[in-house]
Curated annotation (Swiss-Prot):
Keywords: Cytoplasm, Ribonucleoprotein, Ribosomal protein. It comes from the Eukaryota. It comes from Papio anubis (Olive baboon). One of its GO terms (biological process) is translation. SUPFAM superfamilies: Zn-binding ribosomal proteins. This is Large ribosomal subunit protein eL42. The gene is RPL36A. Gene3D superfamilies: 3.10.450.80.
Length: 106
């Protein structure tokens, strides 16, 4: 279980020094219907017949890499950057600090 604080003192490219940053978890945006690959795929799928491209079944990974979105809290900066972390099954943002040997509750 990974617990990350909601704020972090880290380097800001705009100010060229360490500044406090607000930490949030990156989430993938909705796929566009008008991207060329999607338009081509939909065109190929239309009409009679089954799938024209193979559907991927052989998934290997059980977790995703956590990506943190760091936003500078300075009002006239607000620059953002992404920071990839390791894989984990349970991710928590700004949770209570746990003591050694304490039972984990989900």
């Amino acid at each position: 279980m990974v617990n990350v604080p909601k704020t972090r003192q880290t380097f800001c490219k705009k100010y060229d020094k360490h500044q406090p940053h607000k930490v949030t978890q990156y989430k993938k945006g909705k796929d566009s219907l008008y991207a060329l690959g999607k338009r081509r795929y939909d065109r190929k799928q239309s009409g009679y017949g089954g799938h024209t491209k193979p559907i991927f079944w052989k998934k290997a990974k059980t977790t995703k890499k956590i990506v943190l979105r760091l936003e500078c809290v300075e009002p006239n900066c607000r620059s953002e950057r992404m920071l990839a972390t390791k894989r984990c099954k349970h991710f928590e943002l700004g949770g209570d600090k746990t003591r050694k040997g304490q039972v984990i509750q989900f």
